[in-house]
Curated annotation (Swiss-Prot):
<dbReference type="InterPro" id="IPR027417">
    <property type="entry name" value="P-loop_NTPase"/>
</dbReference>
<dbReference type="GO" id="GO:0045259">
    <property type="term" value="C:proton-transporting ATP synthase complex"/>
</dbReference>
<dbReference type="InterPro" id="IPR017691">
    <property type="entry name" value="Alt_ATPase_F1_bsu"/>
</dbReference>
<dbReference type="InterPro" id="IPR050053">
    <property type="entry name" value="ATPase_alpha/beta_chains"/>
</dbReference>
<keyword id="KW-0375">Hydrogen ion transport</keyword>
<keyword id="KW-0813">Transport</keyword>
<dbReference type="GO" id="GO:0031676">
    <property type="term" value="C:plasma membrane-derived thylakoid membrane"/>
</dbReference>
<dbReference type="InterPro" id="IPR036121">
    <property type="entry name" value="ATPase_F1/V1/A1_a/bsu_N_sf"/>
</dbReference>
<feature type="binding site">
    <location>
        <begin position="135"/>
        <end position="142"/>
    </location>
    <ligand>
        <name>ATP</name>
    </ligand>
</feature>
<keyword id="KW-0067">ATP-binding</keyword>
<protein>
    <recommendedName>
        <fullName>ATP synthase subunit beta</fullName>
        <ecNumber>7.1.2.2</ecNumber>
    </recommendedName>
</protein>
<keyword id="KW-0406">Ion transport</keyword>
<dbReference type="InterPro" id="IPR020003">
    <property type="entry name" value="ATPase_a/bsu_AS"/>
</dbReference>
<keyword id="KW-0472">Membrane</keyword>
<dbReference type="GO" id="GO:0016887">
    <property type="term" value="F:ATP hydrolysis activity"/>
</dbReference>
<keyword id="KW-0066">ATP synthesis</keyword>
<dbReference type="InterPro" id="IPR024034">
    <property type="entry name" value="ATPase_F1/V1_b/a_C"/>
</dbReference>
Amino acid sequence: MVDVHFSDEVPPLRHLLRAGPQAQIAIEGLTYLSANLIRGIALTPTQGLARGARVIDTGQSLQVPIGEHLLGRAFNVFGDPIDGLGPLKGMKRSLHGQAVPLHQRTTGTDILVTGIKAIDLLAPLERGSKAGLFGGAGVGKTVLITEMIHNIVSRYDGVSIFCGIGERSREGEELYREMKAAGVLNNTVMVFGQMNEPPGSRFRVGHAALTMAEYFRDQAHRDVLLMIDNVFRFIQAGSEVSGLMGQLPSRVGYQPTLATELAELEERICSTAHGAITSVQAVYIPADDLTDPAAVHTFSHLSASIVLSRKRTSEGLYPAVDPLQSGSKMLTPSVVGQRHYQVAQAVRKTLAEYEDLKDIIAMLGLEELAQNERQTVYRARRLERFLTQPFFTTEQFSGIPGKMVSLDQTLTGCEAILDDKCSGLSEQALYMIGAVDEAELEHQEREAQEVEEIGQ
């Protein structure tokens, strides 16, 4: 936090101020302390700043570049390239944009297929809406969002923008290399506010990425896929800024303006007649508490919520999507169709009944259940394993080739399990596969091999 005294004209709030020997220290004015005193947040490290140092008003707010020439490049919050490929020239725009007026917004019912069974079945994503990946530390949020980037971007016609807020620099560098190797970097823009940067930088980098996304939607008339990792770090940076500003904290130590700051970011993500911005956001859940204010306020902005479970992670069920807590407003017969809706409801009902029976099984054993209850358990355990899936992004670690599964294959597999057509297959045969045909084919090959061995 920096207090600046102006002897003459005081600049408007949100103007970018410069200080330091080479004007390398960037400050954004946030509030007036008196007629001539303004308090701002440093967007760069303040090393070299001294009391009495000269401060220059740049005469404008923080701006980032816009245009087609951004594709294939990586930037920081100032729009400066950080990929070592040289500087950029061209138009710039203030990152403090306004949300699209209500009468200019459009809504649709187009589904964005991810190729991930658990998501496409239970929490389908809507084109031009927002979806959240909720989970505590180490449950696979970044892996899942990286897999979604891999699956969607490779067959996506629009522009993809990845915004890293307060996450590890190593993960950003790995993602950059992976996208370059996959040949999708030329249609992608990456913007980073790394965890070692000041809170002001992390607090504004989301707006920088959105400003670039709005250009592609409104001027280039293209659809945009905006990936944000992690929204909680944006809220956390706002909390740090609020504390430095001297504001009294609200519940659980968050800033009193949490809802307003989050809405300023989220409400800019929408569809218009020119194009759509579809956003997938990772949201860290402190202490796995879904009632945390950061999670609660984020939930209210989303059309699909994908909750990752630590319990499923401990059981080795990846992706660790909780089928009972995850959901989407798109999962209605009028949008996804009667077949998809009925299969999803049947899967949820079976898994919910199994969850209720777990305590009885733990105390009395599976043998004490009625025949129909045992059948429910067998189906649920097979469904749990069928909804696991090997990822392309973890192929180098697991040694299992990644699989992209169509929605029809997912529905067919779930129907087969619910109708007991897979009762001849072991639970393990359905674990970490793509379509159910793979398990059936492997089962047939094993039977043929056993017959051949007996014949010999």
